[in-house]
């Protein structure tokens, strides 16, 4: 574990840490289309949630796991988070604004009483990490805002949305209210992943 960062996890294609490997920092995720992950190393301050294609979810704390195939034979999604959090809402952001580059805008998501996460349009998923709530299936409200990255940094959307973790099936869902900005849409991609799109400015 000496070469593994405290906030880093490494997933491997073969058992006993062999074959191709991928490094994950806390707040990131890996979507494995082939289902071919067989072992992993988890940093001291990390927690890794892994879903199998059959819906099974397993959490791994800091340590080495040379063979995960008995519990997760066909890995689907790998989510790396800080150890003090329970789950992550994985969000990617894009836009449909004509004449603008894919990465012209920035989405900020701020969960209630937590630090915000900034997500540039056109990129991969970023994790909005959520602690365990009481009760565990409580909703948490998140403030969202979208602005252009270039000067003058004009704001084009402001609003809020609710997310909820369901322990019985280890999935994250969302609920829109009147606070959701009308020029945006959100689509649920999988058990923890969502795409937010800025439709117009």
UniProtKB/Swiss-Prot annotation:
One GO BP annotation of this record: calcium-dependent cell-cell adhesion via plasma membrane cell adhesion molecules
Chief location: membrane
Gene3D superfamilies: Calcium-dependent cell adhesion molecule-1
Keywords, in A-Z order: Calcium, Cell adhesion, Cell membrane, Membrane
InterPro entries, per the entry: CAD_C_sf, Dictyostelium_CAD, Membrane-bd
Keyword Chloroplast tagged: no
Up-regulation conditions: Expression is controlled by rpkA.
Signal sequence interval, chain numbering: none
Intracellular or extracellular location(s): Cell membrane
Entry-linked Pfam families: Membrane_bind
Entry GO terms, CC: cell-cell junction; external side of plasma membrane; extracellular matrix
GO molecular function, one term: calmodulin binding
Statement: the UniProt record of this protein carries the keyword Calcium: yes
Entry similarity comment: Belongs to the Dictyostelium CAD family.
Function: Mediates calcium-dependent cell-cell adhesion during the early stage of development.
PANTHER family (UniProt xref): CALCIUM-DEPENDENT CELL ADHESION MOLECULE 1-RELATED
Name this polypeptide is given: Putative calcium-dependent cell adhesion molecule 2
High-level lineage: Eukaryota, Amoebozoa, Evosea, Eumycetozoa, Dictyostelia
